[in-house]
Amino acid sequence: MAQSRVTDFYACRRPGLTTPRAKSICLTPSPGGLVAPAFTRSSSRKRARPPAEPGSDQPAPLARRRLRLPGLDSCPSSLPEPSSPAEPSPPADPSPPADPGSPVCPSPVKRTKSTTVYVGQQPGKIPSEDSVSELQSCLRRARKLGAQARALRARVQENAVEPSTPDAKVPTEQPCVEKAPAYQRFHALAQPGLPGLVLPYKYQVLVEMFRSMDTIVSMLHNRSETVTFAKVKQGVQEMMRKRFEERNVGQIKTVYPTSYRFRQECNVPTFKDSIKRSDYQLTIEPLLGQEAGGATQLTATCLLQRRQVFRQNLVERVKEQHKVFLASLNPPMAVPDDQLTRWHPRFNVDEVPDIEPAELPQPPVTEKLTTAQEVLARARSLMTPKMEKALSNLALRSAEPGSPGTSTPPLPATPPATPPAASPSALKGVSQALLERIRAKEVQKQLARMTRCPEQELRLQRLERLPELARVLRNVFVSERKPALTMEVVCARMVDSCQTALSPGEMEKHLVLLAELLPDWLSLHRIRTDTYVKLDKAVDLAGLTARLAHHVHAEGL
């Protein structure tokens, strides 16, 4: 008995070797048009890799074959069966040549023209008219999709170029304005607590500068020292970790003119080598009039009063800008200053213009020799005749009108005025009466929001949390399986289950408000020293949520 070779067992583990299957023109062949391959045995010892059978479970085709256009699904999957697989003949392709820029790449078809065995094609026989028409329709669809893709790409490039045009005009309109960082422009939106008359970021910094400056001045003034700007600058910069300059002092004087008296004095002891005793220095003296009641020292109460006055002056400045903004609306609005509790939602607080610094006393101007004629007149007796002649020639040369030293610098061009804003074209065709009603209703909402007191704002915030709290409260009663629970137990369960971080006392206030709005669903019973909460679990929760939303909408106007 002959010994079996290892290669004899390959036929048992793998499907039989078959002849290479003909590659059709379409990328996805149809199983119905394939012919069962004939099993052949290779004479070589090398194991040939057989192609996959149509009926066997094979992995998904390559990604190149899967990424096809939707229009190619109608391509013919196969051609008629051949009578002689060994006689390949290229088919006659009456369709026009494919566009190289079209999405369908014709390279697989060209590559298989000379090497593919076409199934079911006799020598001298051309494909049917149906397959030719389908190929032509696929090619037309591919060319159409390619043209659409090119048009879309051109449209995207045009849209990318258009936004750069208005940006190039911005530096010509406002060349000196620098855009502030985001944490400064949106500082008012990040303030904790209830919304109110929030100051801009630059005004908040100025308030802190005044507080630091007042603290340093009070310390030096109470010790009977001469307060100079150099001492105050060093102390304020150490407290705030920010630059403090004379411009900031001028802004403080603009906001609070009666806070300090500024003078230029000399012969002030400095105890520093960088500043001479004979130099003029800016001295600061606090004005203790009505705030301190005639006292000679700055106390903590006086500092607090001065800080409140400074902040109130800044608020009044922002109110003036807010009033101008309300007058520019359509229709214009007017809110009394004593009833204003918060800014208009569209009023950008951080875009309020900066405070112009006031003029501070400057050191007296001493006589300085700036021209050659003055030097010649002052030191004529100290110079030799040769030096005197050279200086006189230089003075005459510099006094000529055509000399380059007398040319005046050109004045900066006045920036063009900002054109008025054009009326929006989106409202074209809309009834004017409808627009007036909508604007009047919007004005009513904004007025109610700007004049709302803090208590109403707090109640509105609680109303917005009630729908979620009602759902959590019902789940607590369902899990406890009791008709009534004590207030302490309910508050503890809801604090642990609610997403919003609330204290037990705040949660109890929410439950009292919920019982006030929905007495038929939730009731509170005071028994001895405890308060019991009773809930009707049979009531539909969706209806309760709708009622709470109606309350929020009614009180939010």
Curated annotation (Swiss-Prot):
Biased composition (Low complexity): 69-81
GO CC aspect terms: kinetochore; nuclear body; nucleus
Domain-related comment: The PIP-box K+4 motif mediates both the interaction with PCNA and the recruitment of the DCX(DTL) complex: while the PIP-box interacts with PCNA, the presence of the K+4 submotif, recruits the DCX(DTL) complex, leading to its ubiquitination.
Keyword terms: Cell cycle, Centromere, Chromosome, DNA replication, DNA-binding, Kinetochore, Nucleus, Phosphoprotein, Proto-oncogene, Ubl conjugation
Bias type Pro residues, positions: 82-106, 407-422
Interaction with LRWD1 as annotated region, ranges: 463-557
Record PTM Phosphoserine, positions in chain: 30, 107, 392
Superkingdom per UniProt: Eukaryota
Species whose genome carries this gene: Mus musculus
UniProt keyword Nucleus present: yes
Motif range (Cyclin-binding motif): 65-67
Disulfide-bond pairs as recorded: none
Localization, UniProt: Nucleus; Chromosome, Centromere, Kinetochore
Record-level Gene Ontology MF annotations: chromatin binding; DNA binding
Protein name, entry field: DNA replication factor Cdt1
Protein's job: Required for both DNA replication and mitosis. DNA replication licensing factor, required for pre-replication complex assembly. Cooperates with CDC6 and the origin recognition complex (ORC) during G1 phase of the cell cycle to promote the loading of the mini-chromosome maintenance (MCM) complex onto DNA to generate pre-replication complexes (pre-RC). Required also for mitosis by promoting stable kinetochore-microtubule attachments. Potential oncogene.
Residue segments, region Interaction with GMNN: 163-203
Subunit composition and interactions: Interacts with GMNN; the interaction inhibits the binding of the MCM complex to origins of replication. Interacts with MCM6. Interacts with CDC6; are mutually dependent on one another for loading MCM complexes onto chromatin. Interacts with PCNA. Interacts with LRWD1 during G1 phase and during mitosis. Interacts with NDC80 subunit of the NDC80 complex; leading to kinetochore localization. Interacts with KAT7. Interacts with ubiquitin-binding protein FAF1; the interaction is likely to promote CDT1 degradation.
Post-translational modification Phosphothreonine, affected residues: 28
